[in-house]
């Protein structure tokens, strides 16, 4: 059988799975019999050959039939068909991953448009809310603030030494659901599954991590099945000291590792990115990944409306870390088109729970002030739209139904093709649905959402609303990081990713309302995005590997394939 691909390991460290061209197979890791069947990385279930069964002590431990990978997949799909809810399907797939990693990824990658909504948005929201109640088996690492002073020792308990990416959260702001504490661990687990399923990043180098600093969610503290530390969150200073120790420990224990910050509270997300981005290889997906996929949607929309990014006037509903990340990346793209940073920021306004950001407000964080422009104070979004005259409206408020009919109609009066992105998730938090956007704009809106919605019919046309989901970006960036091992991660990499993604949207797809490529071909899409990002890494002299002659071929050489390998 074909062999699963892997990457060369530096400095003599050993991966948990055999190398791409290795022949020692299971013997190289000393697994036989039941131990082999209980290893999800090496388990082949019913696909072991007769020679493998004889050599590895498996005779009598598995059914007599030797099945192909396709037949195994058929059984999985049949069993999934008997599940009645997406949460049940999620639980089934998690159990599959715990038993047979190869078959899990073969399943997800066989039909990404079907399975991404199950293993991630929107099902992941319910899975996180019920995390302690559906918990089966430990995955990733749980690092408690009570271990402060001993973080390096804890990290050394992880069995894989060549970790390339740690995805880490403190559970402080999970999706649009707020503080979920340890329940938020579902997010790093799911994010890293998408690294592999969407961009082919080898899973053995990926580590989900939860930094447990407590929770202020009293309902969780009262839940007897809650899995986290039962105490309120610490002071900001105590938290940041803990994160400092964590970041330093990662650099020592996993020297080739990039830190992916995920779902921290808004002010912490902005502060921690600023604190570390020029010191270590790290990024924040909520800030940079969200900014990149939104910029990609804007670039695609401009293929319809004409014009450049620098000419757009943008209003955000929401002014937290996501809005700041989006605004910062869009402003950087405007600077690349010739504007000064100050002029680019002047094109972007924000509106939050207390109204329009303007200099007279005394409740603003420093990172919000570049987007507080001289305007009369206002708590009326429609009035702000009429005054500012934006070409694009972006919702990152986490509050559903806030793009009301008057809001959409105001945008439609100002623009022949208003660009309206309702990015909050999960589904019930979306600022408006595609049906509302198309109906209230009379079919004129160029719409995208943060979660997947079904097709919409309006005025005799069928619209396919695009999903501006970060999974178009962060797995590809993760693959580029995995392959090039950059010393730093820069905004230029995310801008390049946005252009590479938008370039793959066809005129026919734009005509149907799609602003992003179809999910059905997401691996090919993200390989091309990763190659573009890799070129930026090499052009910036940030890579720690030699530049290849062909970046796309280089990326493809690292892509994991969910195929069993020969073990004897």
Residue ranges and their predicted role:
Residues 380-389, 398-420:
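Rossmann-fold NAD(P) dinucleotide-binding segment
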Residues 357-359, 376-378, 396-400, 407, ...:
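N-terminal Rossmann-like NAD(P) cofactor-binding subdomain of oxidoreductases
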Residues 279-280, 284-395, 544:
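Glycine-rich phosphate/diphosphate-binding loop of Rossmann-like nucleotide-binding domains
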Residues 154-155, 176-187, 218-225, 269-275, ...:
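Short acidic, glycine/serine/threonine-rich loops at helix termini
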């Amino acid at each position: 059988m074909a062999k699963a691909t892997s990457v060369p390991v530096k400095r003599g460290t050993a991966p948990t799975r055999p190398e791409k061209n290795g022949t020692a197979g299971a013997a190289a890791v000393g697994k036989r019999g039941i131990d082999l069947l209980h290893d999800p990385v090496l388990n082949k279930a019913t696909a072991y050959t007769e020679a493998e069964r004889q050599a590895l002590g498996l005779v009598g431990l598995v059914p007599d039939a030797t099945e192909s990978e396709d037949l195994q997949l058929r059984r999985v799909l049949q069993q999934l068909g008997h599940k009645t809810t997406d949460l049940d399907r999620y639980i089934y797939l998690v159990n599959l991953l715990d038993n047979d990693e190869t078959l899990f990824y073969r399943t997800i990658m066989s039909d990404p448009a079907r399975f991404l909504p199950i293993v991630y948005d929107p099902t992941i929201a319910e899975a996180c809310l019920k995390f302690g109640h559906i918990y089966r088996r430990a995955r990733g690492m749980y690092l408690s603030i009570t271990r402060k002073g001993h973080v390096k020792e804890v990290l050394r308990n992880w069995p894989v030494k060549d970790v390339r990416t740690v995805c880490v959260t403190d559970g402080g702001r999970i999706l649009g659901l707020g503080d979920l504490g340890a329940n938020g661990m579902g997010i790093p687990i799911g994010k890293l599954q998408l690294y592999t399923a969407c961009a082919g990043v080898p899973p053995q180098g990926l580590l989900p991590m939860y930094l447990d600093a407590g929770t202020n969610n009293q309902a969780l503290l009262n839940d007897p099945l809650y899995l986290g530390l039962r105490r309120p969150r610490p002071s900001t200073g105590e938290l940041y000291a803990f994160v400092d120790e964590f970041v330093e420990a990662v650099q020592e224990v996993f020297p080739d590792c990039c830190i992916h910050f995920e779902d921290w509270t808004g002010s912490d997300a902005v502060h921690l990115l600023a604190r570390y981005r020029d010191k270590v290889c790290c990024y924040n997906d909520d800030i940079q990944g969200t900014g990149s996929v939104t910029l990609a949607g804007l670039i695609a929309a401009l293929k319809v409306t004409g014009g450049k990014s620098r000419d757009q006037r943008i209003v955000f509903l929401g002014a937290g870390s996501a809005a700041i990340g989006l605004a910062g990346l869009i402003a950087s793209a405007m600077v690349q088109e010739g504007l000064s940073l100050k002029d680019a920021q002047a094109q972007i306004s924000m509106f939050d729970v207390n109204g329009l950001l303007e200099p007279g407000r005394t409740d603003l964080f420093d990172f919000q002030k570049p987007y507080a422009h001289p305007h009369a104070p206002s708590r009326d979004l429609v009035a702000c739209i009429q005054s500012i005259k934006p070409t694009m409206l972006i919702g990152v408020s986490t509050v559903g139904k806030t793009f009301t009919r008057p809001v959409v109609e105001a945008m439609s009066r100002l623009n022949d093709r208003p660009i309206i992105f309702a990015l909050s998730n999960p589904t019930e938090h979306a600022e408006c649905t595609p049906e509302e956007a198309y109906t209230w704009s009379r079919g004129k809106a160029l719409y995208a959402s943060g979660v997947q919605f079904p097709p919409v019919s309006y005025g005799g046309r069928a619209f396919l609303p695009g999903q501006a989901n970060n999974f178009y970006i962060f797995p590809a960036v993760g693959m580029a990081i995995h392959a090039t091992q950059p010393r730093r991660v820069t905004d230029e990499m995310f801008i390049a990713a946005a252009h590479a993604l938008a370039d793959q949207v066809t005129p026919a797809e734009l005509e149907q309302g799609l602003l992003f490529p179809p999910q059905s071909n997401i691996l090919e899409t993200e390989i091309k995005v990763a190659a573009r990002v890799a070129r930026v890494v090499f052009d910036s002299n940030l890579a720690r590997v030699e530049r290849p002659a062909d970046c796309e071929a280089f990326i493809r050489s690292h892509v994991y394939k969910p195929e069993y390998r020969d073990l004897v």
